[in-house]
Amino acid sequence: MAKTNISVILPVHELNEVTKPMFQNAIQSVTDQTVQPDELIIVVPKGSETAKYIKDFDFGANKKLVVIAENDGATDFSSQVNYGVSVAKTEWFSILEFDDEYAKIWFKNVVDYRDAHTNVDLFLPIVIDVDSVGNFIGFTNEAVWANSFSDELGILDNNALLTYQNFNIDGMVIRKSTYDEFGGFKPSMKLTFIYEFLLRMTFKDVRVMVIPRFGYKHVNQRPGSLFSNYKETLDPVEAKWWLSTAKKEYYFPKDRQITYESQN
């Protein structure tokens, strides 16, 4: 079977009886790909019960792809992804959340578009958003295919991002060297790390294309998730502060460890 030169980075900070079936579905969505990734890197907290569960998990057809990366550092999403990228051996990588799923032909579409658009370093899917029980909520990333949204149809640019923030990097496929060169995710950006990352990439003239195909199913703000729990503690003033901070921090390639408390 053809390979893609892509590693899947799958961060897992904790699993429970609700999320274990979701994790199984996420793994199955990798198995079902018509074109397979080269690696499935599962990042877990070192020495944790989650690490033990993952080590004992039956990966079936994916077994030869699996790399279990035990991280003894921070367990937030950004830090886990950054750690996974550091051990990846492929030219490209993709991000899969443990409660989400790829569409079956996502990597085939990536390979086809990558071959046709050799100057693009970051590909995004059109994301189907669902709630925690699978009910449809809406789509994300499709806006770049609307006329006059950005300077070039299908390409996300910095000017468009400064006026419209609703984009998702889940499922993205990015050249590893580009991610490393421009700093990766910034853990301190908490609420707006996705937005800041895309602003930074486009500011650095990284070409970001949304492939006009449904490529990823995302569970939006699942109760109990790290992001959902964090948002519940926010007031509108802090939420607005994170948005404005992202628009300032994207000029800096490295995380400056900014916190809301230290700036207010």
Name each model feature, range by range.
Residues 71-88:
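Glycine-rich, basic loop-to-helix element that forms the pyrophosphate-binding segment
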Residues 142-164:
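Short, flexible, basic/aromatic active-site loop/helix in glycosyltransferases
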Residues 25-37:
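Short, acidic, metal-binding catalytic loop of nucleotide-sugar glycosyltransferases
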Residues 126, 209-215:
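Catalytic beta-strand/loop signature of glycosyltransferases that borders the donor
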Residues 107-139:
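Conserved donor NDP-sugar-binding/catalytic core segment of glycosyltransferases
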Residues 93:
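Short aromatic/hydrophobic "clamp" motif used to bind/position activated sugar donors
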Residues 190-197:
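Acidic donor-binding loop at a coil-to-helix junction in glycosyltransferase catalytic cores
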Residues 214-221, 227-259:
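Catalytic core of nucleotide-sugar-dependent glycosyltransferases
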